[in-house]
């Protein structure tokens, strides 16, 4: 073969065994190599190294590209090349001619002393030259996975070996954290980071289907895996306790009965405001099965419909509550200012609101009757609501010329307005329940939306001022016979028939000629205008005086609720007529008005400013508190509305998908993610405030003035009336400047505390429920020392210390206990169940956090008590005999057994108020240690024996401080509830529970305060008197006594673990008592707002830009870099990438 042919084929042969000049390599890359080079040039540089192979001694040399597999095979000789068919005929002939050539007999062998840098052995065959060393072909392997990398490798500095080591492509990209978590291949271009993993864009899919998440799609995480909306909703999403829909975004977590319940935010607000769940238990069991049977589009449509329904319910009813509550507030404010005429205009607007609600209830009732379903129980509540409003009109007519500062009149007004809010709330709940029952039981989908649309008509009611010209009711309604039946002349307070201005009972319809009467139907009745009589259809047509061409007037049906509205209008017109006749009401000056009221209400025209008199008017105080609350919430609402656009643009959250959702809490919580972006060179910033999230702000319970706020403010006003001195220097709980921890005033000299100079207007009010365990122990100790001088005739100091569990046992007492069994004291203690279990165990095992009562701290009470009181608050507590009657004894036994087995097994809403009250008494009666404890029974009885009322109050107050924390928190919640129940004792002459504070104390005392001994001395009357004082002044007894509170404010008390002896505490207490007077102090009832737990909506962005430089950039920088950017975390965790210089590995033969 000629030299020319050899160059042509890229082959070089030698006959003397000495290798000539190495052949020139002519690389011919394959198509696959071309594609790889093109892709890597654009996205990521990597070295593609070629190998030069030299034949063994006496053979031919071949220079071409080698793969890692080919490098393991021996080079072919001439015969093998000829037989392989790779050469054409000319090349085969050339090989034959070369075979005929004569080789020298003596062949010169070259000895080699090359050493492999990896194994240290002598290289006698093929070898690789790379990284400045030579290796056996089989020894040149990846440092991480030990695979052959002679064909292509990536050098990297190894800090442990202090030299460069070769890596394969996979391990190199693994060290750079640039491997796809799905396919395991290198990431050379755009990628997505999610769940702390990286994915190719086309590989970021659902774990159960092939849904690819685009830049603006949402994904859901569960147990480290990614799911689409459909599979997460049907398989793993937590269910809402209200609607049983999947929880995919924000939610509220409620800990109840030892179980954590998850709620949608609007579902929880609907349940909290009206105690209504949107889904029944029967449908909850099959909801997941139904969801799995739906397609993705059907599931999306169903969820969208559910979301719209929930929002429609909340929006319509919450706004209706706000309108009605504001109207009630305006009405009472006008009455307090003496603006009686304007108050009538305000009442006219309130009647229109009621008319809208009654119209919606009638529409639901009509649909229920078409399905022959059970009617809604709305009659009693609607009747009591109208009676209270009529009573307000009667009271205004009675006292419009008299002094309205009379305490009895003030209390009557407060009770009536409390009843208005209470019964209006019940009617909203009843109507909502009826609409949901039609939808779920009878598949009537249009009933509830129709009712909500009717309620939304309240926004069209005139919202302007209360000018006297706005009164548009006909004055002829003031006639004496306008509210009577036309036939029987009796009161018409039920459904009736109407023809023009004639109204009569359906049962009173009777033909004056033939005496026909049908009490079930009224279609036959006609009105004869000539005779002014009611006739049947036959008598009416047979009459010669009636022309056939004339229309035949027939009666129309008037529902019961429509008749109630008609009666309210009559009462209002009569009041308006009285006020017009006595023109004094429109000219009299308003009672002393606070100038601050001018800017309080935007809907009420305040009276002219007058000087504030020294004597405080009760209505003016109430109006200040109520309108401060309205102003606070309305300003918050206006601020949120005006800043909605700004917040939607500024409240942005930028992060990559790699950001972990650590705020979401538990693994079972839904992790909802969204990533967005476009192929630009920068990170994408996506707004986190989507329309749904902005709409979530509407579910803030503190943004609107509701019917629940009215009883709270009225309760505060009553407390102010009973104890004005306690509230003289205390701000209202609606004052934003009010804080729990206001500092006490100390007189210091050279850093040493000389004494305390308390000021009544600045002294903080502490509550027993807010104290820490150390402060409670200190309070008990000091209370015993203060209590001893007051009861020294009855108990010694040691006996008081033993009552409060503060006395440490002596030697003989401990010696005697050593002989007792370990379970001697606890052998009869029941630990499982609900009834008969000690209160401390119930609180520790399944407590409910309650904010009812005074103070801002959370009170830990048994879950049963929390559920029972919450259910009773939503009931009608004006039922006669509540807490006095024993209820159904058999049902009580069934309920107690069910609660012992499973606390969640009963539905409190299905029980009557009397049954729930009896169940609560049974629970208290069966406590092993009563609520007020056996040990302190004597102190409570002793307090009732003291002659001085001031001493009785002090002894009771200090005795309360000695109660265990669980007993005291439970007592505070129960007594606060009983105080509220007593407000329903007398609503009017016919309605009321007749259970005032004394009657409640009489029936509850045998269950909470009794002696352990069988002493024949009957002390039940003394116990009742003690409990009566506790209920009547429960807010005062929830405070820390003033002298103890000042001690707790001492900064040196707990400084450096200061240890006080009893004598030091007693001496310190005497110093404080000598400096201050013990006047009565109290605080307004303050209810802490319930915080809503939000699940953070994770907003992430996809970095779709290629962070990998091109090949030319690598040539300039001689480095490889791959960075991941996280806009949400400025301090990125990106690690420095190793410097890589492209090199060629040369494979030779030794």
Swiss-Prot record:
Superkingdom, taxonomy of origin: Eukaryota
Locations listed in the record: Cell tip; Nucleus
UniProtKB keywords: GTPase activation, LIM domain, Metal-binding, Nucleus, Phosphoprotein, Repeat, Zinc
Compositionally skewed regions (Basic and acidic residues) per UniProt: 1-10
Amino acid composition bias (Polar residues), ranges on this chain: 40-62, 598-617, 1104-1134
Gene Ontology MF terms: GTPase activator activity; metal ion binding
Organism: Schizosaccharomyces pombe (strain 972 / ATCC 24843) (Fission yeast)
Annotated Low complexity bias: 642-655
Known role: GTPase-activating protein for Rho1. Involved in the F-actin patch localization, cell morphogenesis, regulation of septation, and cell wall synthesis.
Region (Disordered): 1-78, 586-683, 726-759, 1078-1097, 1104-1150
Site (Arginine finger): 884
Every Rho-GAP domain range: 837-1038
InterPro entries: Rho_GTPase_activation_prot, RhoGAP_dom, Znf_LIM
Secretion signal, residue range per the UniProt entry: none
Main subcellular localisation: other
Gene behind the chain: rga1
Protein name: Rho-type GTPase-activating protein 1
């Amino acid at each position: 073969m000629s030299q020319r042919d050899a160059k042509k084929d890229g082959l070089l042969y030698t006959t003397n065994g000495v290798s000539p000049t190495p052949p020139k390599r002519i690389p011919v890359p394959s198509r696959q190599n071309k594609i790889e080079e093109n892709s890597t040039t654009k996205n990521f540089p990597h070295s593609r190294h070629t190998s030069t192979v030299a034949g063994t001694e006496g053979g031919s040399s071949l220079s071409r590209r080698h793969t890692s597999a080919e490098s393991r095979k021996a080079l072919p000789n001439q015969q093998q090349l000829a037989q392989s068919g790779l050469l054409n005929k000319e090349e085969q002939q050339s090989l034959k001619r070369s075979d005929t050539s004569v080789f020298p007999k003596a062949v010169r062998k070259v000895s080699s002393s090359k050493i492999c840098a990896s194994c240290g052995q002598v290289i006698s065959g093929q070898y690789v030259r790379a990284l400045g060393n030579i290796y056996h072909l089989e020894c040149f392997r990846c440092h991480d996975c030990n695979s052959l990398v002679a064909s292509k490798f990536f050098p990297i500095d190894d800090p442990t070996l202090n030299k460069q080591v070769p890596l394969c492509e996979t391990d190199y990209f693994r060290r750079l954290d640039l491997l796809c978590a799905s396919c395991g291949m290198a990431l050379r271009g755009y990628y997505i980071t999610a769940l702390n993993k990286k994915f190719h864009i086309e590989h970021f899919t659902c774990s159960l289907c092939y849904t690819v998440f685009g830049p603006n799609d949402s994904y859901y995480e569960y147990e480290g895996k990614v799911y689409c909306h459909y599979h997460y909703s049907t398989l793993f999403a937590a269910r809402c306790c209200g609607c049983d829909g999947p929880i995919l975004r924000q939610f509220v977590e409620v800990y109840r009965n030892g179980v954590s319940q998850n709620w949608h935010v609007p579902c929880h607000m609907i349940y909290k405001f009206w105690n209504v769940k949107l889904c029944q238990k029967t449908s909850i069991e099959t909801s997941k099965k139904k969801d799995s049977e739906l397609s993705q589009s059907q599931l999306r449509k169903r969820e969208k419909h559910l979301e719209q329904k929930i929002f429609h319910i909340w929006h319509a009813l919450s706004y209706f509550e706000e309108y009605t509550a504001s109207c009630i507030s305006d009405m009472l404010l006008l009455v307090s200012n003496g603006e009686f005429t304007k108050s009538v205009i305000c009442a006219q607007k309130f009647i229109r609101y009621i008319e809208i609600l009654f119209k919606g209830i009638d529409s639901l009732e009509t649909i229920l009757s078409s399905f022959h379903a059970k009617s809604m129980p709305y009659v009693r509540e609607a009747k009591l609501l109208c009676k209270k409003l009529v009573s307000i009109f009667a009271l205004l007519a009675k006292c419009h010329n008299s002094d309205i500062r009379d305490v009895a009149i003030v209390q009557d007004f407060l009770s009536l307005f409390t009843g208005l809010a209470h019964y209006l709330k019940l009617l909203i709940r009843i109507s909502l329940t009826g609409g949901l029952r039609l939808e779920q039981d009878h598949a009537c989908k249009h009933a509830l939306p129709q009712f909500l649309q009717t309620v939304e008509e309240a926004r069209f009611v005139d919202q302007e001022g209360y000018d006297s010209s706005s009164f548009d009711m006909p004055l002829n309604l003031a006639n004496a016979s306008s509210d009577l039946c036309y036939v029987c002349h009796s009161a018409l307070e039920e459904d009736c028939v109407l023809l023009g201005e004639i109204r009569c009972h359906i049962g009173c319809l009777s033909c004056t000629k033939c005496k026909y009467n049908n009490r079930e139907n009224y279609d036959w009745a006609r009105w004869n205008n000539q005779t002014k009589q009611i006739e049947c259809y036959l008598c009416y047509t047979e009459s010669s005086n009636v022309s056939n061409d004339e229309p035949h007037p027939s009666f129309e049906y008037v529902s019961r609720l429509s008749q109630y509205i008609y009666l309210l209008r009559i009462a209002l017109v009569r009041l308006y007529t009285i006020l017009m006749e006595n023109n004094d009401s429109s000219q009299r000056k308003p009672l002393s008005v606070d100038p601050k009221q001018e800017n309080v209400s935007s809907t009420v025209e305040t009276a002219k400013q007058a000087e504030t008199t020294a004597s405080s008017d009760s209505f003016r105080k109430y109006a200040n508190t109520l309108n401060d609350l309205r102003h606070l919430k309305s300003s918050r609402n206006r601020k949120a509305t005006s800043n909605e656009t700004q917040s939607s643009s500024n409240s942005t959250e930028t992060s990559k998908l790699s950001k972990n959702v650590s705020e979401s809490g538990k693994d079972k919580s839904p992790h909802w993610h969204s990533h967005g972006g476009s192929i630009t060179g920068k990170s994408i910033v996506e707004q986190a405030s989507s329309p749904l999230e902005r709409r979530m702000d509407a579910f803030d319970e503190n943004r609107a003035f509701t019917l629940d706020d009215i009883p709270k403010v009225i309760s505060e006003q009553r407390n102010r009336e009973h104890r004005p001195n306690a509230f003289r220097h205390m701000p209202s709980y609606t004052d934003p400047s009010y804080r729990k921890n206001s500092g006490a005033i100390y007189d210091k000299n050279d850093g040493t505390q000389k004494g305390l100079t308390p000021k009544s207007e600045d002294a903080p009010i502490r509550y027993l429920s807010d104290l820490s365990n150390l402060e409670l122990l200190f309070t008990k100790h000091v209370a015993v020392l203060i209590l001893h001088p007051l009861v020294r005739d009855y108990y010694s100091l040691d006996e008081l210390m033993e009552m409060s569990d503060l006395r440490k046992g002596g030697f003989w007492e401990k010696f005697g206990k050593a002989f007792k069994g370990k379970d001697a004291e606890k052998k009869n203690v029941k630990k499982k169940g609900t009834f008969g279990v000690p209160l401390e165990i119930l609180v520790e095992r399944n407590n409910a956090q309650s904010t009812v009562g005074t103070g801002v701290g959370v009170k830990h009470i048994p879950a049963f008590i929390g559920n029972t009181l919450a259910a009773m608050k939503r009931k009608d507590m004006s039922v006669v005999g509540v807490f006095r009657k024993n209820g159904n004894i058999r049902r009580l036994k069934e309920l107690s057994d069910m609660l012992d087995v499973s606390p969640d097994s009963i539905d409190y809403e299905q029980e009557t108020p009397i049954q729930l009250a009896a169940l609560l008494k049974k629970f208290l009666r069966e406590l092993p240690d009563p609520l007020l404890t056996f040990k302190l029974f004597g102190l409570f009885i002793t307090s009732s024996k003291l002659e001085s009322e001031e001493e009785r109050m002090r002894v009771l107050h200090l005795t309360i401080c000695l109660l265990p924390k669980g007993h005291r928190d439970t007592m505070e919640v129960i007594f606060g509830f009983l105080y509220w129940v007593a407000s329903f004792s007398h609503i009017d002459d016919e309605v009321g529970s007749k259970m005032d504070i004394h009657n409640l104390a009489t029936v509850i005392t045998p269950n909470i305060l009794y002696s352990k001994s069988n002493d024949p001395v009957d002390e039940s009357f003394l116990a009742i008197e003690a409990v009566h004082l506790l209920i009547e002044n429960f807010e005062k007894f929830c405070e820390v006594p003033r002298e103890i509170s000042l001690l707790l404010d001492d900064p040196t008390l707990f400084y450096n673990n200061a240890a006080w002896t009893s004598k030091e505490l007693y001496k310190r207490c005497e110093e404080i008592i000598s400096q201050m007077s013990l006047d009565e102090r109290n605080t307004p009832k303050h209810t802490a707002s319930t915080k809503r737990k939000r699940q953070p909506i994770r907003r992430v962005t996809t970095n779709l830009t290629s962070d990998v430089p091109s090949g030319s950039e690598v040539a300039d920088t001689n480095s490889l870099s791959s960075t991941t950017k996280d806009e949400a975390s400025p301090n990125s965790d990106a690690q420095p990438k190793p410097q890589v210089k492209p090199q060629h590995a040369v494979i030779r033969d030794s």
